[in-house]
């Protein structure tokens, strides 16, 4: 699977990350959870005391960020950061910035191995030419229970 891109797409709470982690471990692929990048950016915005509605300050902040690291993302799975990530993800400039970051990260990893990326719209928007595209469909009640459990844990 060297130099191949696999995407795992689907709604929140569908199990995209779990599926992607399993495949990454099984096939020795680099795994990128795209949601971590939104959470990392949200954390940076919060640490800089920028109001989530102040798009001008957020856009100015983006100009000063060279790279967003996907490492140590579990620390970012708080309700405050998750809510902020959902809010900023609706902004086109932020989505474009994060999409570009994802492409850079994957390009750097493809030199060494294949990649699997999970996230919403990851196969239809960001990596349209992925070698394999997986779309996860899960009942809404199950998704809601999964999301609730994630927030509690």
Role assignments for model-derived ranges:
Residues 11-14:
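ATP-binding Walker
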Residues 37-113, 121-126, 141-145, 149, ...:
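ATP-dependent small-molecule kinase phosphotransfer cores
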Residues 1-3:
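Phosphate-binding P-loop
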Residues 6-8:
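Hydrophobic anchor at the beta1->P-loop junction of P-loop NTPases
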Residues 17:
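Walker A/P-loop
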Residues 115, 131-135:
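Short, well-ordered beta-strand core segments
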């Amino acid at each position: 699977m060297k130099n191949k891109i696999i995407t795992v797409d689907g709604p929140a709470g569908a199990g995209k990350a779990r599926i992607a982690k399993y495949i990454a471990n099984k096939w020795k692929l680099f795994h990128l959870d795209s949601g971590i990048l939104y959470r990392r950016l949200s954390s940076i915005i919060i640490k800089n005391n920028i109001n989530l509605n102040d798009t001008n300050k957020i856009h100015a902040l983006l100009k000063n960020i060279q790279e967003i690291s996907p490492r140590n993302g579990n620390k970012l799975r708080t309700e405050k950061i998750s809510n902020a990530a959902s809010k900023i993800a609706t902004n086109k400039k932020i989505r474009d910035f994060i999409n570009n970051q994802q492409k850079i990260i994957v390009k750097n990893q493809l030199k060494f191995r294949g990649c699997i990326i999970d996230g919403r719209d990851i196969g239809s928007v960001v990596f349209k030419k992925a070698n394999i595209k997986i779309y996860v469909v899960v009942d809404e009640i199950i998704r809601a229970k999964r999301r609730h459990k994630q927030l509690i844990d």
